[in-house]
């Protein structure tokens, strides 16, 4: 019961925080004081992290120091207009948008965190102990990611439900879309197979280790219903946030990198993630 309460409290807190930040960014589009507040919200932690990371790195910590620096850079770089303008040349990002700036700070900050984690000793090895997930946890995770995706594209502030759904690209598939999806599925299997062969050549024991990790994660859902829920929850939730919300604004590379690094703590920061990146792209 305690785990359920903690899960619900954490989920509700994150959603309320996302709603508050989305409204703040929306107000910052036309309210200069709100925009200044956003710069302070991300800029102060960024500066402190950069200073702390530099100090820790000078003292010889080659793991925590770079991690703090990367997170600080991720939070702080989007606040610099030249950085946003440079990124806007290769992505659909609007350099004048406070909303885009806010989202980019969060995305790059998270990316810095996960890249920093990959620098830890033995980070490339799959973890030995991974808690398994149940059907309810998967459903809550999917609902949470979908809710975050809707909030990220403006619900309920600058888009209504219909407009937000259209912005996320959630529509009934037509025959052409179904055909593309089937072809893409086969292509993903090919890419995954190639990645498996490459990892087998360079790290022969990796495949067996990953199989053990997957077995641990899916221990509670190794049944027909669990398999359907596992596939649907991951597909719906992750596609909504990465493909629906992030990719149309930040291009395909940044969301794909975040998607790849997000799975590092589960599978280890190793060659398997390169295959995941290729599949994601």
State what each model feature region is.
Residues 32-42, 98-103:
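Membrane-interfacial loop-to-transmembrane alpha-helix junctions, especially the N-terminal start
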Residues 57-58, 84-93, 271-273:
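A cytosolic-side transmembrane-helix exit/cap motif
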Residues 1-37, 50-58, 185-281:
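Transmembrane helix-loop-helix hairpins at the membrane interface
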Residues 17-27, 67-89, 148-161:
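Membrane-water interface of transmembrane alpha-helices
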Residues 2-5, 89-107, 111-144, 153-233:
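Juxtamembrane helix-loop-helix connectors linking adjacent transmembrane helices
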Residues 40-57, 109-117:
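A generic, lipid-embedded transmembrane alpha helix
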Residues 6-13, 59-74, 130-148, 184-185:
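Alpha-helical transmembrane segments
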């Amino acid at each position: 019961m305690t785990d359920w309460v903690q899960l619900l409290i954490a989920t509700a807190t994150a959603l309320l925080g996302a709603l508050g930040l989305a409204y703040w960014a929306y107000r910052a589009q036309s309210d200069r004081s709100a925009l200044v507040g956003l710069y302070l919200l991300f800029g102060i932690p960024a500066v402190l992290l950069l200073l702390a990371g530099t100090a820790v790195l000078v003292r010889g910590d080659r793991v925590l120091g770079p991690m703090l620096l990367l997170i600080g850079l991720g939070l702080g770089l989007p606040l610099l207009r030249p950085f946003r303008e440079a990124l806007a040349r290769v992505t659909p990002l609007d350099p004048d948008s406070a909303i885009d700036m806010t989202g980019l700070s969060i995305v790059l900050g998270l990316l810095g965190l996960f890249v920093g984690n990959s620098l830890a000793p033995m980070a490339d090895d799959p973890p030995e102990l991974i808690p398994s997930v149940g059907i309810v946890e998967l459903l809550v995770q999917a609902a949470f990611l979908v809710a975050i995706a809707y909030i990220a594209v403006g619900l309920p502030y600058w888009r209504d439900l219909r407009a937000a759904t259209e912005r996320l690209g959630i529509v009934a598939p037509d025959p052409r879309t179904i055909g593309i999806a089937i072809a893409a599925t086969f292509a993903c299997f090919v890419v995954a197979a190639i990645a498996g062969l490459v990892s087998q050549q360079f790290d022969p024991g990796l495949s067996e280790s990953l199989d053990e990790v997957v077995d641990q994660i899916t221990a509670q859902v190794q049944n027909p219903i669990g398999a359907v829920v596992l596939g649907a929850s991951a597909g719906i939730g992750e596609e909504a946030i990465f493909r629906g919300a992030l990719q149309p604004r930040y291009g395909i590379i940044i969301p794909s990198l975040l998607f790849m690094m997000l799975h590092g703590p589960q599978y280890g920061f190793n060659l398997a993630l390169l295959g995941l990146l290729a599949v994601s792209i």
